[in-house]
Amino acid sequence: MTSKAVVFAYHDIGCTGIEALLNAGYEIAAVFTHADDPRENTFYASVARLCAERGIPLHAPEDVNHPLWLERIRQLRPDFLFSFYYRRLLGAELLACAARGAYNLHGSLLPRYRGRAPANWVLVNGETQTGVTLHRMIERADAGPILAQQAVAIDPEDTALSLHGKLRKAAGALLRDSLPLLALGVLPEVEQDESQASHFGRRTPADGLLDWHRPARQLYDLVRAVTQPYPGAFCQVGEQKLIVWSAEVVAGNHGREPGSVLSCDPLRIACGEDSLVLRFGQRGERGLYLAGTQLATELGLVEGARLRGAASGPQRRTRVLILGVNGFIGNHLSERLLRDGRYEVHGMDIGSDAIERLKADPHFHFVEGDIGIHSEWLEYHVKKCDVILPLVAIATPIEYTRNPLRVFELDFEENLRIVRYCVKYGKRVVFPSTSEVYGMCQDPDFDEDRSNLVVGPINKQRWIYSVSKQLLDRVIWAYGQQGLRFTLFRPFNWMGPRLDRLDSARIGSSRAITQLILHLVEGTPIRLVDGGAQKRCFTDVDDGIEALARIIDNRDGRCDGQIVNIGNPDNEASIRQLGEELLRQFEAHPLRAQFPPFAGFREVESRSFYGDGYQDVAHRKPSIDNARRLLDWQPTIELRETIGKTLDFFLHEALREREAQA
């Protein structure tokens, strides 16, 4: 009997998977893929074209986990689901649609290199072997039982592109041998060894920055991991960007400082250990592909000159002052900037539990203090630093009604003082506005430059946060007309690890997801304010921080005088839906047995929860056209993945609390 499959595929390995299924006698009822991104270098084969040529029904929905698509897939009655380099997570309900199971082909030898871009990461890390793995899909990404693996040797001269070709061939061979056995039901499964698991996140173009203090072999590995068709490794020559496409390691560095030009023919650069010959590269994003010797001539390099990369070169790092550095945005942003290698971070906050992991970094400088008290330190560091981020704010709804004057004093008055220091010393300010400034705007998508900012009556004190932020936005804009360099960014419901503390949720002073998780942890009913019908667009903190880092980088000054929404309009969900997805992942979590039974959902009125001064809004959805245009940024992380990371963080925090109390 023919096995029926629904396939989720992209990339040329997606094509390899589809061809293998057809050759093994599977019936493909439908293929789901992605529309090509015009900003991406699509060097790979087209799943869409293959399906058109083979007469296979093809779909490319934004959300394959949407109930409408779930129902359509159920109606196909598939025996199997297969994912071949599909870029979105398949939810539990979708996985359950397959009568005989759902299977994924992953580009590493699991459990090592779970996550994104494994072919790039193995090269960056200098591995000599990788491979492909066929495994059963469970709700946790890349964590299901293994059915088959095929190893691939990594040669010293392999690039990401050549390695991808090897992986494609290995995938074809593995599927050729495995798919017939899977159809017969005789392919055994082996659980993954969690003690050997490693996980790697997505890579960004900024990760290609060359740090000349590192050994030449590590830089060579970075170059080949991100060379064409990827964005490339790079460094700075004065104000010009030098992209390196090909390099080779040469023994010795003549005892010269890292980043020093040892010769121009060939173009040879001293590293922390040995040296690197830059064989081919280009000047800037639109330059010609040139040999290293010609690049040296065109860039005006001479022996003894210094190239600037991470932690090297004569030009100092950009100094970023983050006030509220221990907060959710502050600690994630600090980590991102320090990883970049071009920044020195100075921070103040009243605590440091979330930044303990950063304190050992020599480019991270922290002082415990209060911006309302330590005014001399504050003014000195505004004068000293290049970019100022005043992130200190009271930003939880219950405090808007419980302590409206404190919200005004901190969120407006204290931050106004910082803005005036920036004016006084001519410093650039990147100010955190808020999605709350849009208030009860009726536009379907909130636009930074056109949407009206609408709030409720004076007796609804919940709007004091919104109007405090809006007033500061207007003051900053007015100072901008007098020469202040600024960017306003508006986060839309960012979520992720270290969002809040469970103790904050216990007194009601936390974000919605933390409140919901606390109820699960303590076995109390999940309270849905006014039924939880309010919709928000939730944004993964990694996506949000990447956009914010690009604002700080401010390439070509394009963010000066701009307002930028940072949110994920594709991740719209009601609070009830958020709670339901949390519950599903909670019940499937490995730590589930450590917590009490689920106590159900309970609907409560907003007045009883927040007090008389509260007023809610039905939806809050951003337009992100400005972010796309100014930052070349697009959020990519799905809500299910963000919920999973956030839940996992708080469950482990709850166990740590329990151990500390024992």
Swiss-Prot record:
<dbReference type="InterPro" id="IPR002376">
    <property type="entry name" value="Formyl_transf_N"/>
</dbReference>
<feature type="binding site">
    <location>
        <position position="395"/>
    </location>
    <ligand>
        <name>UDP-alpha-D-glucuronate</name>
    </ligand>
</feature>
<keyword id="KW-0443">Lipid metabolism</keyword>
<keyword id="KW-0441">Lipid A biosynthesis</keyword>
<feature type="binding site">
    <location>
        <begin position="138"/>
        <end position="142"/>
    </location>
    <ligand>
        <name>(6R)-10-formyltetrahydrofolate</name>
    </ligand>
</feature>
<keyword id="KW-0560">Oxidoreductase</keyword>
<comment type="subunit">
    <text>Homohexamer, formed by a dimer of trimers.</text>
</comment>
<comment type="pathway">
    <text>Nucleotide-sugar biosynthesis; UDP-4-deoxy-4-formamido-beta-L-arabinose biosynthesis; UDP-4-deoxy-4-formamido-beta-L-arabinose from UDP-alpha-D-glucuronate: step 1/3.</text>
</comment>
<comment type="pathway">
    <text>Nucleotide-sugar biosynthesis; UDP-4-deoxy-4-formamido-beta-L-arabinose biosynthesis; UDP-4-deoxy-4-formamido-beta-L-arabinose from UDP-alpha-D-glucuronate: step 3/3.</text>
</comment>
<feature type="binding site">
    <location>
        <position position="614"/>
    </location>
    <ligand>
        <name>UDP-alpha-D-glucuronate</name>
    </ligand>
</feature>
<feature type="binding site">
    <location>
        <begin position="527"/>
        <end position="536"/>
    </location>
    <ligand>
        <name>UDP-alpha-D-glucuronate</name>
    </ligand>
</feature>
<feature type="binding site">
    <location>
        <position position="493"/>
    </location>
    <ligand>
        <name>UDP-alpha-D-glucuronate</name>
    </ligand>
</feature>
<dbReference type="Pfam" id="PF00551">
    <property type="entry name" value="Formyl_trans_N"/>
</dbReference>
<feature type="active site" description="Proton donor; for decarboxylase activity">
    <location>
        <position position="620"/>
    </location>
</feature>
<feature type="region of interest" description="Dehydrogenase ArnADH">
    <location>
        <begin position="316"/>
        <end position="662"/>
    </location>
</feature>
<feature type="binding site">
    <location>
        <position position="462"/>
    </location>
    <ligand>
        <name>UDP-alpha-D-glucuronate</name>
    </ligand>
</feature>
<feature type="active site" description="Proton acceptor; for decarboxylase activity">
    <location>
        <position position="436"/>
    </location>
</feature>
<dbReference type="InterPro" id="IPR001509">
    <property type="entry name" value="Epimerase_deHydtase"/>
</dbReference>
<dbReference type="InterPro" id="IPR050177">
    <property type="entry name" value="Lipid_A_modif_metabolic_enz"/>
</dbReference>
<dbReference type="Pfam" id="PF01370">
    <property type="entry name" value="Epimerase"/>
</dbReference>
<comment type="similarity">
    <text>In the N-terminal section; belongs to the Fmt family. UDP-L-Ara4N formyltransferase subfamily.</text>
</comment>
<keyword id="KW-0448">Lipopolysaccharide biosynthesis</keyword>
<feature type="site" description="Raises pKa of active site His">
    <location>
        <position position="142"/>
    </location>
</feature>
<dbReference type="GO" id="GO:0099619">
    <property type="term" value="F:UDP-4-amino-4-deoxy-L-arabinose formyltransferase activity"/>
</dbReference>
<dbReference type="InterPro" id="IPR036477">
    <property type="entry name" value="Formyl_transf_N_sf"/>
</dbReference>
<comment type="function">
    <text>Bifunctional enzyme that catalyzes the oxidative decarboxylation of UDP-glucuronic acid (UDP-GlcUA) to UDP-4-keto-arabinose (UDP-Ara4O) and the addition of a formyl group to UDP-4-amino-4-deoxy-L-arabinose (UDP-L-Ara4N) to form UDP-L-4-formamido-arabinose (UDP-L-Ara4FN). The modified arabinose is attached to lipid A and is required for resistance to polymyxin and cationic antimicrobial peptides.</text>
</comment>
<keyword id="KW-0520">NAD</keyword>
<dbReference type="InterPro" id="IPR005793">
    <property type="entry name" value="Formyl_trans_C"/>
</dbReference>
<feature type="active site" description="Proton donor; for formyltransferase activity">
    <location>
        <position position="106"/>
    </location>
</feature>
<dbReference type="InterPro" id="IPR045869">
    <property type="entry name" value="Arna-like_SDR_e"/>
</dbReference>
<keyword id="KW-0511">Multifunctional enzyme</keyword>
<feature type="binding site">
    <location>
        <position position="400"/>
    </location>
    <ligand>
        <name>UDP-alpha-D-glucuronate</name>
    </ligand>
</feature>
<keyword id="KW-0808">Transferase</keyword>
<protein>
    <recommendedName>
        <fullName>Bifunctional polymyxin resistance protein ArnA</fullName>
        <ecNumber>2.1.2.13</ecNumber>
        <ecNumber>1.1.1.305</ecNumber>
    </recommendedName>
</protein>
<feature type="binding site">
    <location>
        <position position="116"/>
    </location>
    <ligand>
        <name>(6R)-10-formyltetrahydrofolate</name>
    </ligand>
</feature>
<feature type="region of interest" description="Formyltransferase ArnAFT">
    <location>
        <begin position="1"/>
        <end position="307"/>
    </location>
</feature>
<comment type="similarity">
    <text>In the C-terminal section; belongs to the NAD(P)-dependent epimerase/dehydratase family. UDP-glucuronic acid decarboxylase subfamily.</text>
</comment>
<dbReference type="GO" id="GO:0009103">
    <property type="term" value="P:lipopolysaccharide biosynthetic process"/>
</dbReference>
<keyword id="KW-0046">Antibiotic resistance</keyword>
<dbReference type="GO" id="GO:0016831">
    <property type="term" value="F:carboxy-lyase activity"/>
</dbReference>
<dbReference type="InterPro" id="IPR011034">
    <property type="entry name" value="Formyl_transferase-like_C_sf"/>
</dbReference>
<dbReference type="GO" id="GO:0009245">
    <property type="term" value="P:lipid A biosynthetic process"/>
</dbReference>
